[in-house]
Swiss-Prot record:
Organism: Picrophilus torridus (strain ATCC 700027 / DSM 9790 / JCM 10055 / NBRC 100828 / KAW 2/3)
This protein's name: Tyrosine--tRNA ligase
High-level lineage: Archaea, Methanobacteriati, Thermoplasmatota, Thermoplasmata, Thermoplasmatales
GO cellular component term of the entry, any: cytoplasm
Keyword Transmembrane helix attached: no
Top EC class, one word: ligase
Positions of ATP binding: K223
Motif ('KMSKS' region): 220-224
Tree of life domain: Archaea
Major subcellular location class: cytoplasm
EC identifiers of the protein: 6.1.1.1
Residue positions binding L-tyrosine: Y31, Y157, Q161, D164, Q179
InterPro entries to which the protein is assigned, alphabetical: aa-tRNA-synth_Ic, Rossmann-like_a/b/a_fold, Tyr-tRNA-ligase, Tyr-tRNA-ligase_4, Tyr-tRNA-ligase_arc/euk-type, Tyr-tRNA_synthase
Family label: Belongs to the class-I aminoacyl-tRNA synthetase family. TyrS type 4 subfamily.
Amino acid sequence: MDAIDFVKKNTEEIVTMDEAFKALNNNPKGYIGFEPSGNPHLGTCLLLANKINDMVNAGIKMTVLLADWHAMVNDKLNGDLNEIRKSGELFKRAWLAAGLNSNVKFVWASELVEKSDYWSLLLKVAKNASLLRIRRSLPIMGRSEEDADRDFSKYIYPLMQVTDIFYLDVDFALGGMDQRHAHMLARDIAERMNIKKPVSVHTPLLSSLKGSGRMDSFKKMSKSEPDSAIFMTDSNDDIKRKIKNAYCPMKEVNGNPVIDILKYIIFPYYNDKISIKRPESKGGPVDVDMDSLTRMYISGEIHPVDLKNAVGELLCDIIGPVREKLTGD
């Protein structure tokens, strides 16, 4: 694969592709900011580690910013920095156990905010941002304007995220689609400040195992809803139970969390080839890649029960070694 193919792999959007091509030719640096909180799940551990590795394989020097101060501002773990840092250390162990490239650098936000030039840069960023634009960026932290009006520190959060990007001097800003507002804000402010704009690489978010109701908007895996996500500490029985109960409509791949897990977690792990057991009356075992699986599922050749059985077993194989390193079980 070419470098750009690694960057594009399993992404929702790249802003912009032309800038990405150019940046890849100049010893690029990249970063992803992460708020430590709770326990690692498929999305915050495996999907994230896979995508960071893609960026490393593209020749990008990647940094993970463990955003402890951001998590404190966002009231994660009751704003307790000690607990937030414990969570950050847990995520570091989980990512490395999941195969994160050992050359990836970890930096704590607390290391940055101790430096006076960080805050002078933040003020320059603020001078080039309007209150209206900051308000529009609040969804990056899952907050509303009303939340920020009650706690002004939340207006500082988007400014910190932009400052992180500039302070680390990165060419690529990686994040889920929920971080798009912050990355677009950084690009706009960079243009006003006449400095390089970060290429924004956005990944999909893993949907809740429960799916979304007909009138509901997208729901992602959430640590606050244990049955909506597969956690790295889940037992094999829990993994299989959650997958068995997961939303998986017959012949539908869009909005199907089981299909998403296959696409973003399982196929990358198994080099795009797995085997699915079916009753002999339904054709027997079949080897598939993502394209053939999609066709066969839509046509009804693969039943949801057989799909779930395969996904449950494969996830147990993937998560088992990670769980053992985290818990000893």
